Amino acid sequence: MAAARPIILRFESRNGQFRLSVSPQEQFPFLKEKILENLPKDVEPSSLVLSNKPIGTGGQERQLKDLTGVSIERVGLKHGDKLFIGYQDKQASQAAPAQKHVTADVSRRLNGAPVPETETVAFHPPTSPSATIKNPWEVVQQSPLDDMLDKKDGKIYRPRDPKMCKHGPKGMCDYCMPLEPYDPKYLAEKKIKHLSFHSYMRKVNASTNKAELKSSFMPPLTEPYYRVRRDCPSGHPPWPEGICTKCQPSAISLQPQEFRMVDHVEFASPDLINSLLDFWRKSGAQRLGFLYGTYEEYTEVPLGIKAVVQAIYEPPQVDEIDGITLHEWPNEKEVDEVARQCGLEKVGVIFTDLLDAGRGDGSVVCKRHIDSYYLSSLEIAFASRMQAKHPKPTKWSRTGRFGSNFVTCVLSGDEEGAITVSSYQASISAVEMVRADIIEPSAEPSVMLVQSEDEDTDNKSRYIPEVFYRKINEYGVSAQQNAKPSFPVEYLLVTLTHGFPTEASPIFPASTFPIENREVIGESQELRHVAKKLVSHGDPDKAIREVSDFHLLCFLHSLSMFSKEEEALLCRVATTHDPTEGLKLLNTPGWATLVTVLQESGERPPKRPWLNPADPPRPLSQQGKRHLPSRPESPKSESEQLAKRFKGASLE
């Protein structure tokens, strides 16, 4: 049998392309030497990978060493076919085998300036926009609220107009037919500035998927991507060593966002705001807290969503008169778990920006107004990072996520000197520009700076595309402006409405336990506060009511006295206020352990059983005294009991 005629195979790596003349009966491992001759000298031979598609794009990637016994003709390769090669260099293989690989050539920017070797990617490691999910509507798990809003038709129904409608009661015309939730005339009439997320999604879907065309469904939403693609199929070295029109982002044209992910922020009780303001009133320093609550339907806007805030948790921080410095939050996951068991989630952040006016009437200085700013560039960057950490899962996006429901609230003074709440979100473009390290805050709070590739102060490698925005010039004409070096922050901001319910019904009505991380103003969370709140009064019904405090639940969780089932019961009692569940809680081993610990620490509960609710609680007015009473007549007297209690508490 005559030997098969040799064929030409094409190979492509990030260093370029080359051809090899091979025999169809030749096995793949025997090609190693020929392949290495066409690659850089520092390639690790054992890391060679072959694929039928560009490396990292979902092709059938196989290690060359694993193809022992597999011939070229066996896999169906023919004359002129192309294979893609991936590899690691020796230095990268020894230091970090899982990292991306770069060649030993000097990396340079687009302007020719060399890139330092120690540069790293900023913020989050860039991913590729091509990493989409196949059929996301079958895989992505949305929130129950989104599923419920998806099932609604969203139409705005109108009654028959007696002046314009000429038909009968069962007819319909242009003057009474239902409107789409994104109808511009209806929104202008109701003074709705932004579309709700689901209204915007249906507006985009109406133009993306037309039922009359009977084409396959395509997810209508796509998040912007302003970073360099890392899986470019052109075959050039990855950025910053190489770039082309396929992998570089297009120019950015900023414009006000027409929709918002959340339409309204509702605080379950005014006490939530007052407790945060108390810190400023006592110290004069600013304060920050994270909002925990739920997302519900907002009926004032078509297909609207509102964030209902039920609790504010204040993380470790250093507070000053003109700002806040956040510290590491070691128990964040534990607090999130307590909130989850209560049916809550982290919905946003709130901070104060207050300065007393000095008039003695409680008025504050108005810093934020139309002639200054509403949210500073630093605060927008902070809000963008928070939203990037809390993406919104949705089956209507190709990547399975789109935007974020995370909100940002500010307590500041209005034009009348009163303290008011303002609610905002950073736009989708702002979040991506912060991810891509394109913008940075400015010392002037009303403008945002555009980064420059030449700035190496942060030791970062980044690609900065062109950024433009439109403004009304001195001639009254809308003109496009280059955003470099800075542009107004209003292009990155979305305003929300806020308010309080007509009748407050918070799920934590007994929020009197000391708030965490307030030692700087002399407030701390101690066992004596737990005893005073839960057991000192001797009333089981009151104990069930008093456990309904989010700060108390977090403190009890940190004590690790309850099992998972008991803690779930504790959170259920705190949110439902069910007396039957409360009695189950009082009879659990965890509750008995808590009472024992309070007793051993000097916070002794009553000796006798629970008192009759009709009986008044025992007075504890002498609890703060340190002197011992006079010698009692009987060792069983109340004075001796108090003396023993104070002695046990002397280590405070």
Curated annotation (Swiss-Prot):
Membrane protein topology class: Peripheral membrane protein
Chief location category: cytoplasm
Alphabetical keyword list: Cytoplasm, Endoplasmic reticulum, Membrane, mRNA transport, Nucleus, Protein transport, Translocation, Transport
Disordered: annotated segments: 601-652
Example GO molecular function: ubiquitin protein ligase binding
Domain MPN: 265-402
Basic and acidic residues composition bias: residue spans: 633-643
One cellular-component annotation, GO: nuclear membrane
Biological process, per Gene Ontology: mRNA transport; protein transport; ubiquitin-dependent protein catabolic process
Subcellular localization(s) per the UniProt record: Cytoplasm, Perinuclear region; Endoplasmic reticulum membrane; Nucleus membrane
Function statement: Involved in the import of nuclear-targeted proteins into the nucleus and the export of poly(A) RNA out of the nucleus. Has a role in the endoplasmic reticulum-associated degradation (ERAD) pathway.
Similarity-based family: Belongs to the NPL4 family.
Stored PANTHER family: NUCLEAR PROTEIN LOCALIZATION 4, NUCLEAR PROTEIN LOCALIZATION PROTEIN 4 HOMOLOG
Protein known as: Nuclear protein localization protein 4
